[in-house]
Amino acid sequence: NLERATRLVSETGGSILVITEGVFGMRGDQGKLKEIVALKSKYEFRLLVDDAHGFGTLGKTGAGAGEEQGVQNDIDLYFSTFAKSMASIGAFIASDEAVIKYLKYNMRSQIFAKSLPMPIVLGNIKRLELLRTKPELKEKLWSNVTQLQNGLKANGFEIGETNTCVTPVYLKGSVEEATQI
């Protein structure tokens, strides 16, 4: 409840951080980022988007759900992973320099953390370069996703209203029945 949160921060001197996902990994639907961003000026909050399933797959350049919905520049903290669309390991958070410095020097998990091995870092940089320079790779991904989703529907499977690469398959019946497919 943002009304309640606004009252609390006015009493305590704190601030509000709204956290959501760019793509919800169980259903494949996108977070309502436009609607959330529209509330920022009224409630004065920062927005953190975990876009593990949108990064590399959504938006013109693959920048994710924020780019897809036209609100990427309104996201204050953008978090994603290289483990999904990049088929690698590691993660990143993007924000203003002051926020990144604060996190770097104040998050317990980061104070004594080690960097990723350089071959992994270089591989991730190469993957980012490919994302920017080879749009045909993302086009091929979407061609495959469309074939998969259409094929599942044509064969009577329920996949919900996904508009992303995440393709849930909803099964009716018991767990035993579902495992007998």
Across the structure, where does each feature detected by a protein language model lie?
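Short, small-residue-enriched loops and turns at beta-alpha junctions
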Residues: N1, V23-R27, G54-T57, Q110-I111, ...
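Active-site phosphate-binding strand-loop segment of PLP-dependent enzymes
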Residues: N1-V49
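Short beta-strand
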Residues: I16, F79, A113-K114, E158-N163
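Conserved active-site segment immediately N-terminal to the catalytic lysine
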Residues: E44-F45, G64-F82, K101, Y105
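Conserved core segment of the aminotransferase class I/II
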Residues: L77-F79, M86-P135
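Conserved PLP-binding catalytic core of the aspartate aminotransferase-like
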Residues: E139-L148, N155-I181
